Swiss-Prot record:
Residues 11-157 form the UBC core domain. It comes from the Eukaryota. Gene3D superfamilies: Ubiquitin Conjugating Enzyme. SMART domains: UBCc (SM00212). Pathway: Protein modification; protein ubiquitination. Residues 197-211 have a biased composition (Basic residues). This is Ubiquitin-conjugating enzyme E2 S. One of its GO terms (molecular function) is ubiquitin conjugating enzyme activity. GO terms for cellular component: anaphase-promoting complex. It is an enzyme of class 2 (transferase). Its EC number is 2.3.2.23. One of its GO terms (biological process) is free ubiquitin chain polymerization. Catalyzes the covalent attachment of ubiquitin to other proteins. Acts as an essential factor of the anaphase promoting complex/cyclosome (APC/C), a cell cycle-regulated ubiquitin ligase that controls progression through mitosis. Acts by specifically elongating 'Lys-11'-linked polyubiquitin chains initiated by the E2 enzyme ube2c/ubch10 on APC/C substrates, enhancing the degradation of APC/C substrates by the proteasome and promoting mitotic exit.
């Protein structure tokens, strides 16, 4: 893919270079920047799968591509590591609002990376690019988690990343998800219980009609 460096104004190039340098020396928790000195518009990072999620233990390579209209237009995000996730297509394209309708020119690369990391903790099935993953997340969380864990074990194994970021809005949230007891798992368990109760009630009414 061709570089967009020559298409960006000098002050934007300096701005991006400064932010990437800062992120490299002071990265958010669980995120490691892989700087490309030849093309700063190709920002590659490793993201550590958050604890308590089906992605825990995995290291996921992804990249942001800064187009010629950046920062007026959002960057494009792609996972280079295969991942089973509702908001990531089979070719790695990431669907998240901050890369689309919620983008603002003043939002930086750090904000985008933290948002994508949060997406690993809180998937959004309503804007699914992977329809199968979105359907399983809503209808059968255990199967969704099993598929996601398997993909992580096959494609995303690596050494853990170190680093703490007190501004990371996801760091405390991930701790509540351990062992499938987090809000996502509980929500889907509650939905299943309601469906089972409704089915039993319907079956009972049908049985009474036959008497």
């Amino acid at each position: 893919m061709n570089s967009n460096v020559e298409n960006l104004p000098p002050h934007i190039i300096r701005q991006v270079y400064k932010e990437v340098s800062t992120l490299t020396s002071d990265p958010p928790e669980g995120i490691k920047i892989i700087p490309n000195e030849e093309d700063i518009t190709d920002v590659q990072v490793n993201i550590e799968g958050p604890e308590g999620t089906p992605y825990a233990g995995g290291i996921f390579r992804m990249k942001l591509i800064l187009g010629k209209d950046f920062p007026a237009a959002p960057p494009k995000g792609y996972f280079l590591t295969k991942i089973f996730h509702p908001n990531v297509s089979t070719n790695g394209e990431i669907c998240v609002n901050v890369l689309k309708k919620d983008w603002k020119a003043e939002l930086g690369i750090r904000h985008v990376l933290l948002t994508i990391k949060c997406l690993l903790i809180h998937p959004n099935p309503e804007s699914a690019l992977n329809e199968e993953a979105g359907r399983l997340l809503l209808e059968n969380y255990e199967e969704y988690a099993s598929r996601a864990r398997l993909m992580t074990e096959i494609h995303a194994q690596g050494s853990s990343l170190r680093g703490k970021d007190p501004t990371d809005p996801c760091s405390s949230a991930s701790a509540t998800l351990v062992s499938g007891d987090g809000p996502m798992a509980k929500k889907h368990a509650g939905d299943r219980d309601k469906k089972l109760a409704a089915k039993k009630k319907t079956d009972k009414k049908r049985a009474l009609r036959r008497l």
